[in-house]
UniProtKB/Swiss-Prot annotation:
One Pfam assignment: K_trans_C
Protein name from the UniProt record: Probable potassium transport system protein Kup
GO molecular function: potassium ion transmembrane transporter activity; symporter activity
Family named by the database record: Belongs to the HAK/KUP transporter (TC 2.A.72) family.
Source organism of the structure: Methanosarcina barkeri (strain Fusaro / DSM 804)
InterPro entries, alphabetized: K+_transporter (IPR003855), K_trans_C (IPR053952), K_trans_N (IPR053951), Kup (IPR023051)
Keywords of this entry: Cell membrane, Ion transport, Membrane, Potassium, Potassium transport, Symport, Transmembrane, Transmembrane helix, Transport
Role noted for this protein: Transport of potassium into the cell. Likely operates as a K(+):H(+) symporter.
Taxonomic lineage of the native organism: Archaea, Methanobacteriati, Methanobacteriota, Stenosarchaea group, Methanomicrobia
Amino acid sequence: MFSKSEFREVVKSMGLVFGDIGTSPIYTLTVIFLLTRPTHTHIIGVLSLIIWTLIILVTVEYAWLAMSLGKKGEGGTIVLKEILVPLLKSSRNVAFVTLLAYIGTSFLMGDGVITPAISILSAVEGLRIIPQFENIGQSTIILISAAIAIALFSVQSKGIEKITWVFGPIMVLWFATIGFSGIASIFYTPEVLKAINPYYAIRFLLDNGIIGFFVLSEVILCATGGEALYADMGHLGREPILKAWRFVFLALVLNYLGQGAFLIRNPGSTNFLFEMINQQANILYIPFLLLSVVATIIASQAMISGMFSIVYQGITTRIIPMLKIDYTSGVFKSQIYISTVNWLLLVSVLFMMLIFKESSKLAAAYGLAVTGTMSITGIMMTSIFYHRKNITKALISLFITFIDVVFLLSNSYKIPHGGYWSVIIALFILSLILIYTSGQKKLYKLMKLMKSKDFLEKYKQVYATQNKIMGTALFFTRDIERIPQYISHVMFKNNIIYENNIFISIIKSDSPFGIETSFTKEPAKGLKILEIRAGYMEIVNVEKILKDQGIGEKTIFYGVEDIFTKNIIWRIFSIIKKVSPSFVQFYKLPTDELHGVMTRFEM
C-alpha cells in the first residue's frame, strides 16, 4: 500500500502526466473504424492491437527502458542526447545524434499543436448525443471548442499553480469512470477478453494486408502522450509515475475492451465512448460530458506546461533563441510562462480547428510526429544500451525501435491527408534550431576573441596608468579564457576602467539541476571572476546571486552583435537575433545599470 505522501504524488502525476493518453479513448476506436468495417473479427483484432501497443510502446519502451535512463532524475530527448554523446568517440556520430535530438524535439513540439485541438474538439462533439443538441452544426462545435482554447491559453500568464492540485483528483475520477464503464460493458459481452491474446493482433494484420498496415496509423492514437511518462520524470519522480501508470493502464484497457464490446452489440454506432455511457446511465451523461471536457482541458494544460519546459530547456542548452520568460509562481521555480510560445500555440491550435473542422479529420494529421519521436527515442536508447554493454536491453530496445518504425511508416499515408501539417510544423521548428545553432557557431568564429594571457597583460598596464571610475562594473563572458571583443573595446579602446571589474561567466552543466556560485582566484588587481555553474533546467536568478555575493554594481556591460550579410540564411539568423531578447533582458538584469556595446560582424 501507499503512504499518504506517496499517494499524493501518484494522484498528482495522474493530472500532470496522463491527461493526453487518458483522453485518447474519446476518439481512438471511433477513428479506427472509419478505416475498417466493425465486424466481430476486426473488433477483436483491433482491441488486441491497442492492448499490445500500450504494452510494447508505453509500458516497455517508456515505463521500463526509457525511465531507467534518467540523468539526476530528469528525462526527455535532450537528456538522452546528454547521456549518449559522452559514450560516442566519433565526431560524426556526435553530430548525427545531435541532429536526431533536434528532430525529436521538433516532432514533440509539432505534436503539441495537435493535442489540444483534437482533444477539445472530440469532447465537445459529445454534445450531439444529447437529444436537444443532436442537430448542432459543426461550426457551433468549432466555436465552442475555440472559446475553450482561447480561455485556456489566456489564463497562462496568471499562473495555474493555485489550481493544479485539483487536476489529479479530477483525472482519478475520469480514469475510474471510464474503467468502471468498460467493466459494465464487458459484463454483457465477455468474449472481448480474448483480445488480450496477441494472436488476434497478428492475425488481424496478416488477414487484412495493406489495410491492416494502415490501421496501425490510427491504433497509435491510443499511445499518444506515452512519451510524457519519461519527459515529466524530472518534475514528479520515477516511482509515482510508474505506480500511477498501473492504474491508468488498467483503466484504459478496460475501457477499450468495453467500447469494443459495445460496438459488437451496436455495430451502427458512430461515437462509441459517448454512446456507451449514454446507454449505460443516461441520467449521468451530461455530468460525464462535462468531465470529459475538463479532462481534455487538463490534457491540454499538461501539453502547454510541457511545451514551456521543452522551450526553456532548448534556450538553456543554446539550441533555441532566447525568449522573454516570466515566472508565475513565487513558490515553484519551475512554473514559467513564455508569451511568444503561448500565443503561437493558440494561433496554431485555432488554425488546426478551422482547417480540419472535425476530430476524426484531425486524426489524419495526428500520429506522424508521435511515431517520429518514439522512433528517435528507440534509436538513442538502443545505442546507449549497446555502448553500456547491456546487450539484453539493447536487443529489446532494437526490437521496439523496429515496431516504432513500422508505426511511423504506416503513418506515411497520412501525409497527403493532412499529415503534412505536422511535418511542416516540425520542419519549421527544426529549421529555426539549425539556422540558430549554425549562426551562433559562425558568429563565434568571426569574433576576435582575445586570449586571457594577452588580455591580462594589457589590462594590468591600462589599470596601472589610467584614471579609474569609482564603483564596480560587471562584464558577461561565456569563456574566461577567451575574452569577447566588446570588453576590449570598453577597456582599451574607450579607456573605461572601473575600480572593481567583475567578469561573470554562466556555465551550463551536463546535469539538469543545481547551481554553484564561486569567485575564482583574482587574476589581477581590480579584476575578479565570478563563475555561475547551473544545470540546464535551472532557472537562474542572476540579480539574486549578485546580491547574495554582496556585489553592488554601478554598471553592467554586455555585447550586442550587429550582423551585416547578403546570405539569405544569415539574414534569417540576423532577424532572429534582432527580435530575440538580449542576454541581459533574458536574465532580467536592472535596466538602469545596463550598457550595450555594439560590434559589427559581416557574415
